[in-house]
Amino acid sequence: MKMIEVVAAIIERDGKILLAQRPAQSDQAGLWEFAGGKVEPDESQRQALVRELREELGIEATVGEYVASHQREVSGRIIHLHAWHVPDFHGTLQAHEHQALVWCSPEEALQYPLAPADIPLLEAFMALRAARPAD
């Protein structure tokens, strides 16, 4: 079975995270997800994330700590999804590949119809965040 490596960005600003709505003509249309995409053979996960966020959102991202990985089978392929925290970026967000973008708290994000693969990543991020010492 083919394995596909995918990276996802949990972009955080002022305590809120960014969700992106999948386009109407896509697989899992209308569901909300973390921006990201496939890792090319010649790049690291961090490099892939910076490239994907530039392509999808028009931003230059600062990739922070690794959050979690999740694996699931989709259409006869194994998708290995890796989430990274993005605590900072430069540029103005633009939805190049998504229907809509929304900022919300991680708790509010659970109320959105999320892409199933992103739910365990959000939960892992919330657990990490809860364990962080207060500034």
Swiss-Prot record:
A Gene Ontology annotation in the biological process aspect, one of them, is: DNA repair
Which cofactors are reported in the record for this sequence? Answer: Mg(2+); Mn(2+)
> Mutating residue 118 to A: effect?
Abolishes enzyme activity with dCTP and 2-hydroxy-ATP and decreases activity with 5-methyl-dCTP. Increases activity with 8-hydroxy-ATP
- Motif Nudix box extends across 37-58
Protein's UniProt name: CTP pyrophosphohydrolase
List of residues binding substrate: 34-39, 72, 118
Q: How is the cofactor bound?
A: Divalent metal ions. Mg(2+) or Mn(2+).
Subunit text? Monomer.
Please describe, based on the UniProt annotation, the reported consequence of changing residue 33 to D.
Decreases enzyme activity with 2-hydroxy-ATP, dCTP, 5-dmethyl-CTP and 8-hydroxy-ATP
Question: What does the record say mutating residue 55 to A does?
Answer: Abolishes enzyme activity with dCTP and reduces enzyme activity with 5-methyl-dCTP
Recorded GO terms, molecular function?
8-oxo-7,8-dihydrodeoxyguanosine triphosphate pyrophosphatase activity; 8-oxo-7,8-dihydroguanosine triphosphate pyrophosphatase activity; 8-oxo-dGDP phosphatase activity; 8-oxo-GDP phosphatase activity; dCTP diphosphatase activity; hydrolase activity
Q: How does activity depend on pH?
A: Optimum pH is 8.5-9.
